[in-house]
Regions:
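C-terminal peripheral helix-coil segments that are non-catalytic and often amphipathic
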Residues: 87, 91, 121-129, 150-189
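Basic, helix-initiating cap at the start of DNA-binding domains
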Residues: 1-24, 28-40, 53-58, 62
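Amphipathic alpha-helical linker/stalk segments
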Residues: 57-84, 117, 121-125
Length: 189
């Protein structure tokens, strides 16, 4: 008799779902392909994750949670945070693809996403209170994220015309975040 390891099966299903959603998007992903790749019965997907929507949410939460752990938010060092985020993005294109598909096909946020971004905004609010600056915390976070994601978000044609390698692009992102922070971190009189 073969004893099934539920956690291992669930992990294989999630890993297979990450790949399937990254390469086919939500609409193109097939539960049967996920089950085959995970070497699991299709019914186990429904038992562990509910339905395709919930499985996609689990994939998003895994990607967001993994990024949150791998790239700790440092409001007191936003250029450093931007650099680490840039590095993570450059090294994890599967997660970038999942995020792109999510934006196209399922723009609703998960509760984990909302919680993580609320924590970051609260940390920036604390920094703002401590420094006397008057920036809008959500706007600042959006700008830092946009700069860190910029090189994967621009059209390929534009990226091909830009000078410099990945290290140069990274340095430009850091310099841009430094300039932004310098401009808005000063307390207003």
């Amino acid at each position: 008799m073969h004893i099934r390891d539920a956690q291992a099966t669930k992990g294989r299903i999630l890993a297979s779902a990450v790949s399937e959603f990254a390469y086919h998007g939500y609409a193109g992903a097939r539960v049967a392909r996920i089950a085959d790749a995970a070497q699991a019965n299709k019914s186990m997907i429904y038992a562990y994750f509910g339905n395709k929507d919930q499985l996609f949410d689990a994939v998003i939460d895994a990607a967001v949670g993994g990024l949150h752990v791998a790239v700790p938010f440092t409001p007191e060092d936003l250029p450093g945070y931007g650099a680490r985020l840039f590095d993570f993005i450059a090294a994890h294109m599967v997660e970038v693809r999942i995020d792109a598909w999510r934006r196209l096909e399922r723009p609703a946020v998960t509760s984990l996403e909302r919680e993580i971004f609320a924590e970051k905004i609260a940390a920036l609010d604390e920094l703002k209170a401590a420094t006397g600056a008057t920036f809008d915390s959500a706007d600042l976070l959006v700008a830092v994220l946009a700069l860190a994601w910029s090189w994967v978000a621009v059209p390929a044609a534009l990226g091909s015309l830009a000078s410099g390698d990945v290290a140069t692009q990274r340095e430009r992102v850091v310099q841009s975040i430094e300039a932004l922070c310098s401009a808005i971190m000063e307390p207003r009189a």
